[in-house]
Curated annotation (Swiss-Prot):
Swiss-Prot/TrEMBL GO biological process terms: translation
Transmembrane segments: none
Source organism phylogeny: Bacteria, Pseudomonadati, Bacteroidota, Bacteroidia, Bacteroidales
NCBIfam families per record: S15_bact
Entry GO MF terms: rRNA binding; structural constituent of ribosome
Organism the protein comes from: Parabacteroides distasonis (strain ATCC 8503 / DSM 20701 / CIP 104284 / JCM 5825 / NCTC 11152)
Keyword field contains DNA-binding: no
Cited CDD domains: Ribosomal_S15p_S13e (cd00353)
Protein name (Swiss-Prot/TrEMBL): Small ribosomal subunit protein uS15
């Protein structure tokens, strides 16, 4: 599978405050970004997979809501995470 527990742990260690901090906005955004990039590659090959396309749009919306939350609460954390992950504003 493309996202196993070891990969999740690695993402949480890198972007969260610790390996067990799975609920921070940064770690969730990093996880969503990884899943979005994987689904984007999948859709390049399987362009008629409409169920995956819908789930991709839902993930992008979830990530957008988390980014909006970061803008409201701490703009510096927002700027750091979009720079680190290469997300457009």
């Amino acid at each position: 599978m493309y996202l196993d527990s070891a990969k999740k742990q690695e993402l949480f260690e890198k972007y969260g405050k610790s390996a067990t901090n799975t609920g921070s906005a940064e770690s969730q955004i990093a996880l969503f970004t990884f899943r979005i990039s994987h689904l984007t590659e999948h859709l390049k090959v399987n362009h008629k997979d409409y169920a995956t396309e819908r789930s991709l749009k839902m993930l992008v919306g979830k990530r957008r809501r988390l980014l909006d939350y970061l803008i409201k609460t701490d703009i510096e954390r927002y700027r750091a995470i979009i720079k680190e992950l290469g997300i457009r504003k």
